[in-house]
């Protein structure tokens, strides 16, 4: 992937973010995203662009995060060095955002740290202080143009109410908001996983028919978007469980 001359760090981050989305949802190949974010970070640091440097560090952190998720879902252990690398990048991004007055950026940085503790350390009590702060700033994320970022915040708060502080109705509410934001964004790669999460929550809440409807949308959309095999399998498994529950 080539980027052409004359781009600044934030433009490079936008290209890197598209490469990351394609890798995380469709190809599993993270090399381009990692290279582009690293190039953007070096450029921003050279130019004294604090916001660009924060954005690039967060992008590198998210690249590591999605790569680590790919290991977890296939049953592989995430090496301690990989956990440490992701956490270091997320901390660096948050520290840089906190040096600016960029509210949406601070929300991104806080959310990234929440992911480290929720997903890698499996520690909701450590994750939620970060997630709650990001939740309080989520509107600023959308106002800055980061609708997907806001969707992710609502998604993980929804997970909290689904599996930790179990309140299925609140989980449904948060995951509905997350899905609506992704539908507004219109990226077909990002909608199926939101349908799956909401379908799973509706099933737990006892709304079996709605769960089946949501998951019957998710499965063909996953195939149409050529998502990664594990993402398609996740949608298909959730649909099978919901249909079994509907049959009683």
What are these regions (language model features)?
Residues 170-237:
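Ankyrin-repeat and related helical/solenoid repeat scaffolds used for protein-protein interactions
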Residues 14-26, 52-66, 104-119, 148-159, ...:
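Conserved alpha-helical positions within TPR/SEL1-like repeat arrays
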Residues 19-32, 64-86, 115-128, 161-170, ...:
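Short coil/turn connectors between adjacent alpha-helices in alpha-solenoid helical repeat scaffolds
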Residues 1-80, 219, 228, 235-241, ...:
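Flexible inter-repeat linkers and adjacent short helices
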Residues 145-176, 180-183, 189:
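Alpha-helical adaptor scaffolds
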Residues 33, 39-40, 86-93, 112-113, ...:
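Tetratricopeptide repeat
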Residues 7, 12, 32, 52, ...:
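Structural signature of alpha-solenoid helical repeat junctions
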Residues 4, 37, 44, 97, ...:
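Eukaryotic all-alpha helical interaction scaffolds
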């Amino acid at each position: 992937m080539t980027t052409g001359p004359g781009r600044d760090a934030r433009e490079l981050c936008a290209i890197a973010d598209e490469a990351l989305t394609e890798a995380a949802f469709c190809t599993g190949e993270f090399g381009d995203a990692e290279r582009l974010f690293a190039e953007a970070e070096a450029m921003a640091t050279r130019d004294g662009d604090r916001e660009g440097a924060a954005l690039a560090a967060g992008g590198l952190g998210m690249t590591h995060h999605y790569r680590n998720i790919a290991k977890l879902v296939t049953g592989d252990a995430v090496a301690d060095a990989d956990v440490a690398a992701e956490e270091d990048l997320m901390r660096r991004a948050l520290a840089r955002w906190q040096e600016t007055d960029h509210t949406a950026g601070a929300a991104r940085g806080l959310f990234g740290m929440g992911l480290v503790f929720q997903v890698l350390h499996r520690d909701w009590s450590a994750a939620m202080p970060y997630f709650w702060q990001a939740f309080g700033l989520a509107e600023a994320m959308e106002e800055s143009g980061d609708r997907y970022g806001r969707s992710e915040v609502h998604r993980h708060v929804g997970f909290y109410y689904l599996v930790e502080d179990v309140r299925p109705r609140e989980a449904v509410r948060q995951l509905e908001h997350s899905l609506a934001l992704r539908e507004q964004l219109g990226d077909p790669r990002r909608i199926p996983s939101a349908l799956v999460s909401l379908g799973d929550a509706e099933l737990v809440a006892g709304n079996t028919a709605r769960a089946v409807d949501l998951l019957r949308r998710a499965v063909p959309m996953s195939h149409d978007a050529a998502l990664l095999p594990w993402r398609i399998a996740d949608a298909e498994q959730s649909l099978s469980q919901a249909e079994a529950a509907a049959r009683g």
